Amino acid sequence: MSQVILDLQLACEDNSGLPEESQFQTWLNAVIPQFQEESEVTIRVVDTAESHSLNLTYRGKDKPTNVLSFPFEVPPGMEMSLLGDLVICRQMVEKEAQEQGKPLEAHWAHMVVHGSLHLLGYDHIEDDEAEEMEALETEIMLALGYEDPYIAEKE
């Protein structure tokens, strides 16, 4: 299985307590090589202000969000391994993990898995798409040794 090239950018005011680069690498490697070989992904971990600004600019939503995915569209005739960028908001991940009673590490893993599937073209706008994407997320999270991230919704 090929490995994903990771460009990790830590852009928080305080970067202490974040997952290690090796963890981000493990989470990416659990998703992307199943679908695409020789991939490069940038993960940028940001604070609330940057997440809010990007979410407003690119999605028209005037609030921060947990993860944003920016797939790279390769121009016709070019071959590139760049899959895209994930922007993950530290404070949103921490807040959601606490509110949902999930281990913080598991929620970080879920955000990387979720965002990576978006980079690969998966979405959750329509119900059938959401079911397919959530099933994949659950399968990958279980393979990584974490609980089903949607268990609370299924109970």
UniProtKB/Swiss-Prot annotation:
<keyword id="KW-0862">Zinc</keyword>
<dbReference type="GO" id="GO:0004521">
    <property type="term" value="F:RNA endonuclease activity"/>
</dbReference>
<dbReference type="GO" id="GO:0004222">
    <property type="term" value="F:metalloendopeptidase activity"/>
</dbReference>
<keyword id="KW-0540">Nuclease</keyword>
<dbReference type="InterPro" id="IPR002036">
    <property type="entry name" value="YbeY"/>
</dbReference>
<keyword id="KW-0963">Cytoplasm</keyword>
<comment type="similarity">
    <text>Belongs to the endoribonuclease YbeY family.</text>
</comment>
<dbReference type="InterPro" id="IPR020549">
    <property type="entry name" value="YbeY_CS"/>
</dbReference>
<dbReference type="GO" id="GO:0006364">
    <property type="term" value="P:rRNA processing"/>
</dbReference>
<feature type="binding site">
    <location>
        <position position="124"/>
    </location>
    <ligand>
        <name>Zn(2+)</name>
    </ligand>
</feature>
<protein>
    <recommendedName>
        <fullName>Endoribonuclease YbeY</fullName>
        <ecNumber>3.1.-.-</ecNumber>
    </recommendedName>
</protein>
<feature type="binding site">
    <location>
        <position position="118"/>
    </location>
    <ligand>
        <name>Zn(2+)</name>
    </ligand>
</feature>
<keyword id="KW-0690">Ribosome biogenesis</keyword>
<dbReference type="InterPro" id="IPR023091">
    <property type="entry name" value="MetalPrtase_cat_dom_sf_prd"/>
</dbReference>
<comment type="function">
    <text>Single strand-specific metallo-endoribonuclease involved in late-stage 70S ribosome quality control and in maturation of the 3' terminus of the 16S rRNA.</text>
</comment>
<keyword id="KW-0698">rRNA processing</keyword>
<keyword id="KW-0255">Endonuclease</keyword>
<feature type="binding site">
    <location>
        <position position="114"/>
    </location>
    <ligand>
        <name>Zn(2+)</name>
    </ligand>
</feature>
<dbReference type="GO" id="GO:0008270">
    <property type="term" value="F:zinc ion binding"/>
</dbReference>
<dbReference type="GO" id="GO:0005737">
    <property type="term" value="C:cytoplasm"/>
</dbReference>
<dbReference type="Pfam" id="PF02130">
    <property type="entry name" value="YbeY"/>
</dbReference>
<keyword id="KW-0378">Hydrolase</keyword>
<keyword id="KW-0479">Metal-binding</keyword>
